[in-house]
Curated annotation (Swiss-Prot):
Gene3D superfamilies reported for this sequence: 3.40.50.20, ATP-grasp fold, A domain, ATP-grasp fold, B domain
The protein's name: D-alanine--D-alanine ligase
Gene of this entry: ddl
Broad EC category: ligase
Organism listed in the record: Nitratidesulfovibrio vulgaris (strain DP4)
Role of this protein: Cell wall formation.
């Protein structure tokens, strides 16, 4: 097939997108596909024309315009199949303030939060206690994520978010271990337990620096806890109207309470990223995972 590989973009996660796309291109070519790159570095001009002349689009964008559903809407207009979720599900999952309301309404635990659409007053306090996390309302890869332990650290953390993003989310830090779990098709994958380096948390540096975190797959959890993580992951995937694949990130508290932090509709896709690790645990190497995502995308498009 002629595959349009969409990567890069204008978000703060551009470099991550391009790095992952190189491995995807290699896998696509190994599968026998012809690959053309499309990089919406500053705009989406030309995407409709490019998509119309290709059999499939593989999206590897992070943040806008890929995770917010804009590219998916344009591909739908062009009649070009693609992997993963459609426009509505993509938007719902990317917008933490919206997705957290939906998840909580349906009984899925998620940390309390304060949403900010603009810089607050200098003396603003979220009333959530300390420590807490400050992060962009829309975005991934833990960019601009700050752990704030004292009130005087709140304003600089918010400024770091608003310097790059238009909206912020503030959440209390919940003590526990970090767990992530992917979905492929209609199946939850084996969860991963993440142990950041001593004294750190799983931020952008931990994710993309060798040795920044230890990722244990499958997670060394009791069978009933693993089953619970997988059940909640599938429920969240379906509640948000997602398809193809996704990845849910959690904090598992010592008492067994499982708090869903966010759901990613375009999770990292380097061969050593989290979802590819989980797929490998069930016998799918990286090219086989890419082939499965294409198959799911073609099926969703009725091809």
């Amino acid at each position: 097939m002629k595959v349009l590989l969409i990567a890069g973009g204008w978000s703060s996660e551009r470099d991550v997108s391009l790095a992952g796309a190189r491995g995807i291109e290699k896998a696509l070519r190994a599968l026998g596909h012809d690959v053309t790159w499309f990089d919406p570095a500053t705009s989406l001009d030309g995407l409709l024309e490019a998509a119309s002349s290709h059999d499939f689009a593989f999206i590897n964008l992070h943040g806008s315009p890929g995770e917010d559903g804009l590219v998916q809407a344009m591909l739908d207009t062009a009649g070009c199949p693609y992997q993963g979720s459609g426009p509505a599900g993509s938007f719902l999952a990317l917008n933490k303030a919206v997705s957290k309301q939906l998840l909580r309404r349906h009984g899925i635990l998620t940390p309390d939060w304060a949403f900010l659409a603009a810089r607050p007053a200098a003396d603003w306090e979220p009333g959530l206690g300390y420590p807490l996390f400050v992060k962009p309302n829309t975005g991934g890869s833990s960019l601009c994520l700050s752990r704030v332990t004292q009130p005087e650290g709140l304003a600089p953390a918010l400024e770091a978010v608003f310097a790059h993003c238009g909206e912020a989310i503030v959440e209390p830090a919940i003590p526990g271990v970090e767990v992530t779990c992917g979905v492929l098709g209609d199946t939850a994958l084996p969860p991963i337990l993440i142990r950041p380096a001593e004294g750190a948390f799983f931020d952008y540096t931990s994710k993309y620096t060798p040795g920044g975190a230890t990722e244990l797959c499958p997670a060394p959890l009791p069978a009933e806890v693993t089953a619970h993580v997988q059940d909640v992951t599938l429920r969240a995937h379906r509640l948000l109207g997602l398809r193809g694949y996704s990845r849910a990130d959690y904090i598992l508290r010592d008492d067994g309470a499982l708090f869903l932090l966010e759901v990613n509709t375009l999770p990292g896709m380097t061969p050593t990223s989290l979802v590819p690790q989980e797929a490998a645990a069930i016998g799918l190497d990286f090219p086989a995972l890419i082939a499965r995502l294409i198959e799911l995308g073609m099926t969703a498009a009725g091809r």
